Amino acid sequence: MKHIAILGSTGSIGKNTLQVARHLKERIKVVAIAARENIDLLEAQSKEFCPDIIAVFNNAKAYELQKRLPGKTVLAGMEGLLAAASYSEADLVISAMTGTMGLQPTIEAIKAGKDVGLANKEALVSGGAIIMKLVKEKNINLLPIDSEHSAIFQCLNGEALKSVQRIILTSSGGPFRTWTQEQLETVTVEQALNHPTWSMGPKVTIDSSTLMNKGLEVIEAFWLFDVSPEQIDVIVHPQSIIHSLVEFCDGSMLAQMSEPNMIVPIQYSLTYPDRAPGLFKPFDFMKNSKLEFFEPNKKTFRCLALAYEALKCGGTLPCYMNAANEVLVERFLKGELSWKNIGIQLEKLMDQHASISVDSLETILAVDALAREEAARSKLISTK
């Protein structure tokens, strides 16, 4: 029986993780759950799964949930998240809290010697140097939950890193892959939230529409698989059946394929190094006989190009880019700026940032706060 803690249990990844836990109830026990503020769902989850620890980041919401669950101890704030992340009974911690909020709990879990299923790509983007150093020191398994990185992880199993020529991340291309510049001027929030193949939370869905999500995944792959930026390519694959590929020095390639559903990589992380019967029918090749590939347009989707620039520059620029992007996405969702302005504003902000080396968690948090402040007060410029 594997004991798991889920940070972000009320989000898309968290809910899917609990679905797998239901499916594999003879193998998986949920011992801790944590969320930002959705206490209605957290209450229902706690009653179903009976975890030892319940944590809510929002202090007022934690107090309210405690009143609803008098027989339970509800922990609050960042301290509560850290307690859930380092809980002694947990074998595996699923890090699925969106944004930089998940960075400290992820580090805490690794420090406690826990294996980590990482769905929070921002943690590696902002703190990759610190996290990977800790992973090596603690000798834990860092298991990627993103479908692309899970695919690469599986393709590299048993392979020598020196034989890797290229890592190829696939992208659906998002909902605006074929849109003209004129059409992109009028993108609505509803249109950007309508992803063609994946069901995700709002922030990740908007990032997928700008290809920033793919840019963050490029940086994540750099840290996870110890390759150079030049060895990481992105290709648009609208069907999202091939989740990523590895090309080796002898010219052969390995790809991981499945229906586009996050249940598959989540279950792999929960059962690793074993596999277990899944929730899906055998793959239908006739139904999925058309697989297409295109080159991404980095001029139209400038966020992808910006992510490559941040990775090559290094230092605090990836952290700054990630935090500023989070705020710009929030502003778009609130109707404060246009879809095209996300990339334009981000480029302007990144050009103004003086990158320094990442030497501590304090540096990361300070740069994160600076980026958020500057992105929140940045003045909009014309997209034309």
From Swiss-Prot:
Binding residue positions for Mn(2+): D146, E148, E217
Cofactor entry: Mg(2+); Mn(2+)
Keyword Manganese: yes
Record carries keyword Oxidoreductase: yes
Molecular function GO terms recorded: 1-deoxy-D-xylulose-5-phosphate reductoisomerase activity; manganese ion binding; NADPH binding
Superkingdom classification of source: Bacteria
A GO BP annotation: isopentenyl diphosphate biosynthetic process, methylerythritol 4-phosphate pathway involved in terpenoid biosynthetic process
Enzyme Commission identifier(s): 1.1.1.267
Keywords linked to the UniProt accession: Isoprene biosynthesis, Manganese, Metal-binding, NADP, Oxidoreductase
Reaction catalysis annotation: 2-C-methyl-D-erythritol 4-phosphate + NADP(+) = 1-deoxy-D-xylulose 5-phosphate + NADPH + H(+)
One Pfam entry name: DXPR_C
Binding-site positions, 1-deoxy-D-xylulose 5-phosphate: K121, S147, E148, S172, H195, S208, N213, K214, E217
Top class in the EC scheme: oxidoreductase
Residues annotated to bind NADPH: T10, G11, S12, I13, N38, N120, E122, G201
The protein's annotated pathway: Isoprenoid biosynthesis; isopentenyl diphosphate biosynthesis via DXP pathway; isopentenyl diphosphate from 1-deoxy-D-xylulose 5-phosphate: step 1/6
InterPro entries: DXP_reductoisomerase (IPR003821), DXP_reductoisomerase_C (IPR013644), DXP_reductoisomerase_N (IPR013512), DXPR_C (IPR026877), DXPR_C_sf (IPR036169), NAD(P)-bd_dom_sf (IPR036291)
Similarity-based family: Belongs to the DXR family.
HAMAP family: DXP_reductoisom (MF_00183)
Role noted for this protein: Catalyzes the NADPH-dependent rearrangement and reduction of 1-deoxy-D-xylulose-5-phosphate (DXP) to 2-C-methyl-D-erythritol 4-phosphate (MEP).
Protein name: 1-deoxy-D-xylulose 5-phosphate reductoisomerase
Annotated organism of origin: Protochlamydia amoebophila (strain UWE25)
